[in-house]
Amino acid sequence: SVKKEEEVLTGNLQTLKIRVHEGYEEFTMVGRRATAILRKATRRLIQLIVSGRDEQSIAEAIIVAMVFSQEDCMIKAVRGDLNFVNRANQRLNPMHQLLRHFQKDAKVLFQNWGIEPIDNVMGMVGILPDMTPSTEMSLRGVRVSKMGVDEYSSTERVIVSIDRFLRVRDQRGNVLLSPEEVSETQGTEKLTITYSSSMMWEINGPESVLVNTYQWIIRNWETVKIQWSQDPTMLYNKMEFEPFQSLVPKAARGQYSGFVRTLFQQMRDVLGTFDTVQIIKLLPFAAAPPEQSRMQFSSLTVNVRGSGMRILVRGNSPVFNYNKATKRLTVLGKDAGALTEDPDEGTAGVESAVLRGFLILGKEDRRYGPALSINELINLAKGEKANVLIGQGDVVLVMKRKRDSS
């Protein structure tokens, strides 16, 4: 479709520059709990047929479609200023701004959208602005299908791939969509994929953010671990931890972060307290700007499933459960992956075989002499420390364990 820039005014008289998609298009949106077919013209939603597991999933799909329609009544439904930023303090693009705004509160959007009388069609019902079903009236252009949406789709499904810059390509390599030109959501909602970009985790709601964040840490544990011990600030600023912040109660973010960072610093300083599972569990909380306070916590709250659930600082909970026997992590009952190492040891992967029996204490410390190769470690006595070269030229300080690990 052709795209051209247009300036539009929100309900708060803020000017937004959006790239308008001109012409008729049809999209299949596939989320985790809802699917939909959207037919739209230039800045106009023609028809949306949505099917989902529950009221909230249906509402989320409707919001995405309404925002993507770029209709004026959606833009005029904005109350207050749009100033969502990512953690690097860059403003999100206008379409994303709108999406975030209405994901927080869509009441005005639904109220202003307009309703229409509907015909009685088998398997279809209307949906009112308060998200209750109706057989007489429905939000303009919107219908809920009880059976799923496949049979209403006239488009062929295409197999696409997404690269890490969120460019969507077909099998011939043509770019169909990219963030440069469209709200990220639309480009991905229509695809059944696990999002490779953390910007996408939020679209499927809080649970998806939680699971994806921990999956990401586990998948990248090798590099995360080295950064954790050598350059934690860089690690805390990673954009992958950004979506997670929306789950942490606003008032607690800074306190949690300060608490976790202090705890981590103690782990780096105090011998023998490196605890892989605990680091993985608490790491996302350290990403918020920390507040210095003497607050101690035994559990941290995250808002998922409509209420606060607790992650225990020490030990398992329904939100975060590590099974020592299987070495697998489950987050909210979903498998988030396996830890390839014995969490008792401070290391994994290539070095784990050789560094079994050693603790990684943190950054290189020149007082303990030049860096040894892994093979030279054999000569250390129990409790003795040394710098050792691991991985890609990284030097860390290790200590030979005083006890033999079981």
From Swiss-Prot:
Q: Give me the segments passing through the membrane.
A: none
Q: Which SUPFAM superfamilies match?
A: PB2 C-terminal domain-like
Oligomeric state and partners? Answer: Influenza RNA polymerase is composed of three subunits: PB1, PB2 and PA. Interacts (via N-terminus) with PB1 (via C-terminus). Interacts with nucleoprotein NP (via N-terminus). Interacts (via N-terminus) with host MAVS (via N-terminus); this interaction inhibits host innate immune response.
Give its localization: Virion; Host nucleus; Host mitochondrion
Gene coding for it: PB2
Output the Gene Ontology terms for molecular function. Answer: RNA binding
State any GO CC term. Answer: host cell nucleus
Motif window: Nuclear localization signal: 400-403
InterPro entries in UniProt: Flu_PB2_6th, Flu_PB2_C, Flu_PB2_CAP-bd, PDB2_C
Per the record, the similarity remark reads:
Belongs to the influenza viruses PB2 family.
Q: What is this protein called?
A: Polymerase basic protein 2
Q: Which UniProt keywords apply?
A: Cap snatching, Eukaryotic host gene expression shutoff by virus, Eukaryotic host transcription shutoff by virus, Host gene expression shutoff by virus, Host mitochondrion, Host nucleus, Host-virus interaction, Inhibition of host innate immune response by virus, Inhibition of host MAVS by virus, Inhibition of host RLR pathway by virus, Inhibition of host RNA polymerase II by virus, mRNA capping, mRNA processing, Viral immunoevasion, Viral transcription, Virion
> What is the stated purpose of this protein?
Plays an essential role in transcription initiation and cap-stealing mechanism, in which cellular capped pre-mRNAs are used to generate primers for viral transcription. Binds the cap of the target pre-RNA which is subsequently cleaved after 10-13 nucleotides by PA. Plays a role in the initiation of the viral genome replication and modulates the activity of the ribonucleoprotein (RNP) complex. In addition, participates in the inhibition of type I interferon induction through interaction with the host mitochondrial antiviral signaling protein MAVS.
Tell whether Cell inner membrane is among the UniProt keywords: no
Q: Name one GO biological process term.
A: 7-methylguanosine mRNA capping
